[in-house]
Amino acid sequence: MFEKTNRMNLLFDFYQELLTTKQKAYVSFYYLDDYSLGEIAEEFEVSRQAIYDNIKRTEESLEKYEEKLGMLKKYQQREKLFSELEAQLTKKNFLDEQVKDTLEQLKNID
């Protein structure tokens, strides 16, 4: 569950502008503020089932956006390369061929 929550939070960060106002609100309450479905339903005066259905549809939409746009995947690739670069620079005090290659990979991600 923790892994799914983290993924949804990241997807929400990248794609929230593509969501409706209602979708943003429900997902924000559920994933960011850790409200229960019942608490969100009470807040918006709708059924718990309506909240559940909307959140599930929104999760599917976020996954489809990621499938098509790949912003999270690219972000994770960049982060991995930055970590590798940091490790290389820590070991060496100057730019060498290995560091140049890693920098080139960073440039080619997008």
From Swiss-Prot:
Pfam families named among the record's database cross-references: UPF0122
Where would you find the membrane-spanning parts of this chain?
A: none
| Superkingdom of this protein's organism | Bacteria
Q: Which Gene3D superfamilies match?
A: Winged helix-like DNA-binding domain superfamily/Winged helix DNA-binding domain
Q: What NCBIfam families does the annotation carry?
A: PRK00118.1-4, PRK00118.1-5, PRK00118.1-6, YlxM
Q: According to its UniProt entry, what is the function of this protein?
A: Might take part in the signal recognition particle (SRP) pathway. This is inferred from the conservation of its genetic proximity to ftsY/ffh. May be a regulatory protein.
- Report the family membership: Belongs to the UPF0122 family.
Classification via HAMAP family: UPF0122 (MF_00245)
- The protein in question is named UPF0122 protein lwe1821
